[in-house]
Swiss-Prot record:
Residues that coordinate or bind substrate: 92, 136-138, 195, 261, 365
Gene Ontology molecular function terms on file: beta-galactosidase activity
Annotated EC: 3.2.1.23
Family: Belongs to the glycosyl hydrolase 35 family.
Family matches, as SUPFAM superfamilies: (Trans)glycosidases, Beta-galactosidase LacA, domain 3, Galactose-binding domain-like, Glycosyl hydrolase domain
Biological processes annotated in GO: polysaccharide catabolic process
Reported function: Cleaves beta-linked terminal galactosyl residues from gangliosides, glycoproteins, and glycosaminoglycans.
Organism taxonomic ancestry: Eukaryota, Fungi, Dikarya, Ascomycota, Pezizomycotina
Name of the protein in its database record: Probable beta-galactosidase E
Keyword Secreted: yes
Name of the gene encoding the protein in the UniProt record: lacE
Domain of life from the UniProt record: Eukaryota
Length: 1011
């Protein structure tokens, strides 16, 4: 067990990589020397963490509160993660969203973490805080605010301007995190400074980290410590090279962790598993890098992101599906991982332009919990089986990982077996998989192992074990089932539980058609079958041996006080392990000392308590569902589900049982095509009398950007405070009659588009691709211009978000906007440029919805995307029925009321389609979807792939009025028509989830200075 002890750091003198002044070595050493016995609630040894003195496997899921901007729904997600058997959540905070205006960190409304911490505590979830300042996370600029991109210093270096820029945010978030630490009764147990800080340009792996890099990490750590953070720090080294591990000096963290994505990201070919990142020796690398801390994987692939022109997140869910979870996650357990975080477990939404340019609105990520908070993906259930097994297997946490060798223990070279040997216990674990982990074939084998009754070859009663397709299995020997010894089991363990009167219930499972076998000591009574049939049983030496073939039929055996359930894997999916509340300070947090109930209960069970001799359950059902209490620590005489008493019966084996009746509710949703839509021209800039007097003049003759501009002034959007959504440029000149073409090189990120006009004449569009971040092109002018007459180019650019970056590359600074331009017959200085983005730029108008929610379009600048704008004077026109007859931008708005039944969780989404016969529905066009002011969809008709845009309750008012607006940007001369737009519901779920308080929805009011 290790406490946060004093660190004595030898600081070697070395030159800085960057020229700007660096932070003082002395101040960083002083900070390290003050880290003596900061707390004793979270400690560790080489095997695992201890929380309040109890050894815990930390099984964590990644969930970002900023991607679900309805605080009232955070508890729902936490409960679904708790029900997986997880006990922790890792979360990022996004500096770019919280300090979009320099010096003003927004921490109220949807940006407040108070409810996040409260909900985590109530759900029994410990938190791993990851405030950055750089987070990556497929966010625009990796979470770095746009104004920071203007700095001269290299981002993530020890440059004085960069470090000082982080101070206000890190001090603010540090104090918020400190207040929520376990030492203050909160849920935060670990904190991670920076993120994947493992490379630097022109620095080799052996030379990294340099003194400069160490200073950057140490500075972030000091910021957190100065703010009062005392819980252990942890690093996520995506190189697995020991960077910043304990004992490495300046910048070292308390715990060493890695992150890895071995399945990679090809969602278009999800059945092709890559092999070059599959880990085989992590137990050795960890022992070399950090032998005194538990093996921690701070990020491991739980899905994948998809990009513009991709295949949708469903392909990503297939890439990292239940089979991958069985094979690749179990491979990690073979290395003895003690802290395991799955990225993502709930992804959410890149609403309000918060994502980077490589992703679209959905951040579903193919995660175990879908974007609309559903848990129907099979990998949710597979993760539940694994997490619950590890939770009741304390011997795993102290076991010593062995080496996986093909043919060992089986004599079959097509099988790889990785042993974990009991360390202070008699329990051994054997992880079995195909030698070629990508294999989809079937192979038969026998397992020869040593047990307390001697060496045995399993199965003993004839036949063979099998691996069918992509699979991996945990076999155990001498496994402790609460004072009963399970001599061996080829079937996997879901869980075991303590019942009343010293009863123990063990749940084993396997795949359909598999043959399995387990053995019990012969001093127990001969096992008897009390439910099911077709079980073979014999005494072998000093053991009872039981064999069966897995079918959908449940089999239950009893041997004295031990009850064993033999299940088909898909039946095990329907079982839930719920920890009963305990006294403070444990309360709802997971603890090996707590009592549990085991219930078969369908779609979701959330919580349990025993009150007044009744078992009170909360949960969700999507069909009429039988409940059966498989195990409980005491007897009771009734079941209450979501507050309703159920008629109880007894099952065949005497368990208390009941049925939850499901009745689909009546749901009435508006037909968006039939609504009264109001229309506004949102590109008045191309009208002959438009004045851009209030626009930003682009007169900067310098830039700190590493890409130097070529004209007389810089045209980069970030240099003028515009960082997302969309951009509009206006280039003024006087004609001389020699104009025949204009050259424009524009940048908007992958998937971007642009449209260009000369006065009122449409010159064409770049409609975008899934590859181009920039696009240079010559555009022919359609007619001879009149000498001496003023003209103006209007250029609309879609801003898809900034890039992410590897440390030191400054890739996130790559400019958006116009990079280069030329006009035939003119010097470039003849054009005078103005531009706009969102109204106010960094002094953005809507602090409620954040700095990136709005773009440059006229309706957005005026705030008409917000509820209750002055639409009475707008003409009636529908994006679905009418659309646009030429290139341009239209803005459409409507309102409707919803009155959905309470007691049901009813996921809603807006679905775009091309069902219209009008040819304009097949043109290149782009839409933004605003729901009560929140931008919850960017739809690209000709590129895709996203057509379905979930919007959560709390953004949509399920019992009230909703304001919906759609911007329609037609990129082709024939115009555009939204071929179809529907509000659709998924299967309603009878649910115990709490109806959320709506997110703040301030409405329209006149904006000072709007143009």
């Amino acid at each position: 067990m290790k406490f946060l002890l004093r660190r004595f750091i030898a600081l070697a003198a070395a030159s800085s990589v960057v020229a700007a002044p660096s932070v003082s070595h002395l101040s960083l050493q002083d900070a390290a020397n003050r880290r003596e016995l900061l707390q004793d609630l979270v400690t560790w040894d080489q095997h695992s963490l201890f929380v309040r003195g109890e050894r815990l496997m930390i099984f964590s899921g990644e969930f970002h509160p900023f991607r679900l901007p309805v605080p009232g729904l955070w508890f729902d997600v936490f409960q679904k993660i708790t029900s997986l058997g997880f006990n922790a959540v890792s979360f990022y905070t996004d500096w770019g969203l919280m300090e979009g205006n320099p010096g003003h960190v927004v921490t109220d409304g949807i940006w407040s973490l108070d409810e996040f911490f409260t909900a985590a505590s109530e759900a029994g979830i410990y938190l791993i805080a990851r405030p950055g300042p750089y987070i990556n996370a497929e966010t625009s600029a990796g979470g770095i605010p746009g104004w920071v991109l203007r700095l001269k210093g290299i981002i993530r270096s020890n440059s004085e301007d960069y470090l000082r820029a982080t101070d206000t945010y890190m001090a603010t978030l540090g104090k918020i995190i400190a207040k929520a630490q376990i030492t203050n009764g909160g849920p935060v147990i670990l904190v991670q400074p920076e993120n994947e800080y493992t490379t630097w340009p022109n620095v080799s792996e052996s030379e990294f980290p340099t003194t400069m890099n160490k200073e950057v990490m140490a500075y972030a750590e000091k910021q957190l410590r100065d703010a009062g953070v005392v819980v252990p720090t942890v690093v996520n080294d995506n190189k697995n090279l020991g960077y910043f591990a304990p004992g490495t000096g300046l910048g070292e963290t308390d715990l060493y962790g890695i992150d890895a994505y071995p399945m990679r990201y090809d969602c278009g070919n999800p059945y092709v598993w890559p092999t070059y990142r599959f880990p085989r020796d992590w137990q050795h690398t960890h022992r070399n890098h950090s032998p005194t801390t538990p093996f921690a994987i701070m990020e491991f692939q739980g899905g994948s992101g998809d990009g513009w022109g991709g295949v949708t997140e469903d392909g990503c869910a297939i890439l990292v599906n239940n089979e991958a979870v069985r094979v690749v996650y179990k491979n990690n357990y073979g290395f003895g991982v003690g802290v395991f975080n799955i990225y993502m477990t709930y992804g959410g939404t890149n609403w309000g332009n918060l994502g980077y340019h490589g992703g679209y609105t959905s951040y579903d990520y193919g995660a175990a919990i879908t974007e609309d908070r559903q848990i129907w993906r099979e990998k949710y259930s597979e993760e539940k089986l694994q997490a619950n097994f590890l939770k009741v297997s304390p011997a795993y946490l102290t076991a010593t990982p062995g080496n996986g060798v093909n043919g060992s223990y089986t004599g079959n070279k097509d099988i790889a077996v990785t042993p974990l040997f009991g360390n202070g216990t008699t329990t051994n674990f054997y992880l079995v998989r195909h030698a070629d982990f990508t294999s989809t074939g079937s192979v038969q084998y026998q397992l020869s192992v040593s047990t307390s009754v001697g060496n045995v070859t399993i199965p003993q009663l004839g036949g063979s074990l099998s691996l069918n397709g992509r699979d991996s299995k945990f076999h155990v020997t001498d496994y402790d089932v609460g004072e009963f010894n399970l001599i061996y089991s080829s079937a996997e363990i879901f869980t075991w539980a303590k019942g009343d009167n010293k009863k123990r219930v063990l749940v084993l499972y396997g795949g359909a058609g598999e043959l399995h076998e387990f053995a019990l000591p012969k001093h127990l009574p001969r096992p008897t079958v009390v439910d099911g049939s077709d079980v073979k049983m014999a005494k072998k030496g000093s053991a009872w041996v039981v064999q069966w073939e897995v079918t959908a039929q449940r089999r239950v055996l009893r041997a004295g006080k031990l009850e064993i359930h033999l299940l088909w894997r898909n039946d095990a999916y329907q079982h839930w392990v719920l920890e009963l509340p305990a006294k403070q300070p444990i309360a709802n947090y997971s603890s090996p000392s707590k009592e549990t109930v085991l219930v078969k209960g369908g779609y979701l069970l959330r919580s349990a308590c025993i009150t007044n001799n009744k078992l009170h359950l909360t949960g969700d059902v999507n069909a009429t569902t039988p409940l059966e209490v498989i195990s409980a620590p005491k007897r009771f005489d009734g079941i209450v589900f979501n507050g309703q008493s159920l008629k109880s019966t007894r099952s065949k084996i005497g368990n208390l049982a009941a049925t939850v009746r499901y009745q689909p509710p009546a749901i009435s949703l508006p037909d968006l095509k039939r609504l009264d839509w109001k229309y506004l021209d949102s590109l008045p800039e191309i009208s002959p009398d438009y004045s851009d007097e209030g626009w930003m003049s682009l007169t900067n003759t310098y830039t700190n950007n590493t890409r130097k501009f070529t004209g007389p002034t810089c045209l980069y959007a970030d240099d003028y405070g515009y960082h997302g959504g969309s951009l509009i440029y206006r280039g003024h000149f006087k004609a001389n009659g020699d104009e025949s073409w204009v050259f424009l090189n524009t940048s908007g990120g992958v998937g971007f588009a642009n449209s260009v006009w000369l006065n009122q004449t449409f010159l064409g569009s770049w409609t975008g691709s899934g590859n181009n971040m920039t696009y240079p092109r010559n555009i022919s002018l359609p007619h001879e211009l009149s000498p001496g007459k003023p003209y103006v180019f209007t250029v609309v650019i879609d801003h898809m978000g900034q890039d992410e970056e590897a440390p030191g590359t400054d890739a996130i600074k790559f400019p958006r906007g116009i990079l280069d331009y030329a006009l035939s017959g003119h010097e470039v200085s003849d054009l005078k440029w103005k531009m706009t983005g969102n109204l106010g730029g960094e002094q953005y108008q809507d602090s409620t919805r954040g700095p990136l929610n709005e773009g440059a379009m006229y309706a957005e600048r005026r705030g008409y995307h917000l509820p209750n704008p002055p639409t009475s004077s707008w003409k009636s026109s529908s994006p679905i029925n009418d659309g646009l007859t030429g290139a341009g931008i239209g803005f459409y708005a409507t309102s409707f009321s919803l009155d959905l039944p309470e007691g049901y969780d009813i996921p809603l989404s807006f679905l775009f389609n091309n069902s219209a016969s009008d040819a304009r529905s097949g043109t290149s066009y782009r839409c933004q979807l605003f729901v009560n002011g929140y931008q919850f969809g960017k739809y690209v008709n000709d590129l895709g792939p996203q057509t379905n845009f979930p919007v959560p309750e709390g953004i949509l008012n399920y019992n009230g009025v909703n304001y919906v607006a759609v911007s329609l940007w037609a990129l082709e001369p024939q115009g555009a028509l939204v071929g179809g737009l529907e509000l659709v519901a998924s299967t309603p779920i009878l649910s115990a989830y709490r109806k959320p308080v709506p997110a703040p929805q301030p409405g329209w009011k006149p904006r000072r200075g709007a143009y």
